[in-house]
């Protein structure tokens, strides 16, 4: 292993762009925005040994690989292990969810790779740890350009407002308290996917940026939201609910922040999801250890600002990170409450299965630590078909048109990154 001062080493993106083009399987997990507690490490990893494509229960299959993971001689949260994603639809292995809608594209339930080359950036310590063979890396060159052309849209304004109205009937009838309904745009894509990531990291820097490449499939995201982190048997999650756009200037920005924090609708929705997160952690944590040390504060990103809370607990000794995954998946912030009923309503009202949207992207470390972000604010590229996808939380007093515009606010950075309006 080599150690370098971060000031003498190229940025994670500059290094990754030299690596990505030479390998079919590679990943960049980059922290470049948001609060320091979320943005400490960046990880570059690639594999010369292929990857795992999972068409069955991801937790059962990944558990079979945990015992064989080799600990890498590097500090930080990721000490070698598995990097990848889990699709939203994998929840059917853990909850009784109806199977009514077609897939938008052909995605497996999960894909993971075990990297044999790893570079870790510790932004707090100012060091770069290299556990990789860089002799096989070719020249860097420039990032290519790309072209997109509109393909289709799932749930236009009228259709989305209609399903929001239908979901309000479920809420008023007492079936659920909240449901998160999503919609998407798709485009025909040609060119260099890395250019999308380059644009996105400039437009919408976030603590959970990622670029995962599995041959002809890519997940390119700038998620603000952690699904969970396990570090030394402490489990953390940071539910986000309640959103406003950023203001044109400081005065307008503060006005929108105060409007958000004074909104009874947004606060009620947020508290509901904090309770859901507490309940999820309670399934796998030692009784009495689940706490909310920070309740309802605002975090600001390039295009939006959110209400956030922190929920923690101590993991029971008989459980591991994959148990935490199945207990928390999918996040209440992308499904609703109660979760199983909300997800069945999603399956009824949305036009397609979600695939990797609203699933999870991250890693399981060989020492038992793990970190997964929610796959939102993400472009999903499957061969030539590019999808951008966003949802809004519907509660008792939701206005259908306002919820439509919330999805558009959440899509704004992605639309800018791919050059569409």
From Swiss-Prot:
Keywords tagged on the record: Allosteric enzyme, Amino-acid biosynthesis, Aromatic amino acid biosynthesis, Lyase, Magnesium, Metal-binding, Tryptophan biosynthesis
InterPro entries noted in UniProt: ADC_synthase, Anth_synth_I-like, Anth_synth_I_N, Anthranilate_synth_I_arc_typ, Chorismate_C
Cofactor(s), by name: Mg(2+)
Binding site for chorismate: 242-243, 357, 377, 391-393
GO molecular function, one term: metal ion binding
Cofactor remark: Binds 1 Mg(2+) ion per subunit.
Gene Ontology terms: biological process: L-tryptophan biosynthetic process
Regulation: Cooperatively feedback inhibited by tryptophan.
One Pfam family recorded for the sequence: Chorismate_bind
Pathway(s) the chain acts in: Amino-acid biosynthesis; L-tryptophan biosynthesis; L-tryptophan from chorismate: step 1/5
Key word Kinase present: no
NCBIfam families: PRK13574.1, TrpE-arch
Quaternary structure and interacting proteins, as annotated: Heterotetramer consisting of two non-identical subunits: a beta subunit (TrpG) and a large alpha subunit (TrpE).
PANTHER family per the UniProt record, alphabetical: AMINOBENZOATE/ANTHRANILATE SYNTHASE, ANTHRANILATE SYNTHASE COMPONENT 1
Official protein name in the record: Anthranilate synthase component 1
Gene transcribed to yield this protein: trpE
């Amino acid at each position: 292993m080599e150690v370098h001062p971060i000031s003498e080493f190229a940025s994670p993106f500059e290094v990754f762009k030299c690596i990505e083009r030479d390998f079919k399987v590679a990943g960049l997990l980059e922290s470049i925005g948001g609060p320091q507690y979320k943005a400490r490490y960046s990880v570059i990893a690639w594999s010369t040994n292929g990857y795992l494509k999972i068409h069955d229960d991801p937790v059962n299959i990944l558990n079979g690989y945990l015992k064989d993971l080799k600990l890498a001689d590097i500090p930080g949260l990721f000490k070698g292990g598995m990097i990848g994603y889990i699709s939203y639809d994998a929840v059917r292995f853990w909850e009784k969810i109806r199977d009514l809608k077609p897939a938008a594209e052909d995605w497996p339930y999960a894909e993971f790779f075990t990297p044999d080359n790893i570079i870790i950036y510790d932004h707090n310590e100012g060091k770069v740890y290299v556990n990789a063979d860089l002799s096989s890396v070719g020249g860097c060159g420039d990032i290519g350009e790309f072209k997109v052309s509109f393909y289709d849209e799932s749930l236009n304004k009228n259709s989305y407002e209609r399903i929001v109205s239908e979901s309000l009937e479920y809420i008023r009838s007492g079936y659920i308290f909240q449901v998160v309904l999503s919609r998407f745009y798709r485009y025909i894509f040609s060119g260099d996917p890395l250019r999308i990531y380059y644009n996105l990291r400039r437009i919408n820097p976030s603590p959970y940026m990622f670029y995962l490449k599995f041959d002809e499939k890519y997940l390119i995201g700038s998620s603000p939201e952690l699904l969970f982190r396990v570090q030394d048997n402490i489990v953390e999650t940071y539910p986000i609910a309640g959103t406003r756009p950023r203001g044109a200037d400081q005065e307008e920005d503060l006005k929108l922040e105060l409007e958000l924090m004074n909104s009874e609708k947004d606060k009620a929705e947020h508290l509901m999801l904090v309770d859901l997160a507490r309940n999820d952690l309670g399934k796998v944590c030692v009784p009495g250890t689940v706490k909310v040390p920070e309740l309802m504060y605002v975090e600001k990103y390039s295009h939006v600002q959110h209400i956030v809370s922190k929920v923690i607990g101590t993991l029971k000794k008989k459980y591991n990170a994959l148990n935490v995954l199945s207990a928390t998946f999918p996040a209440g912030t992308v499904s609703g409450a109660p979760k199983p009923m909300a997800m069945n309503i999603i399956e009824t009202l949305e036009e397609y299965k979600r695939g990797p949207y609203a699933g999870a992207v991250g890693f399981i470390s060989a020492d038992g630590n793990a970190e997964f972000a929610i796959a939102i604010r993400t472009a999903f590229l499957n061969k030539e078909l590019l999808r951008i996808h966003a949802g809004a939380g519907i509660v008792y007093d939701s206005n259908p048109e306002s919820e439509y515009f919330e999805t558009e606010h959440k899509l704004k950075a992605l639309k800018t990154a791919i050059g569409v309006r």
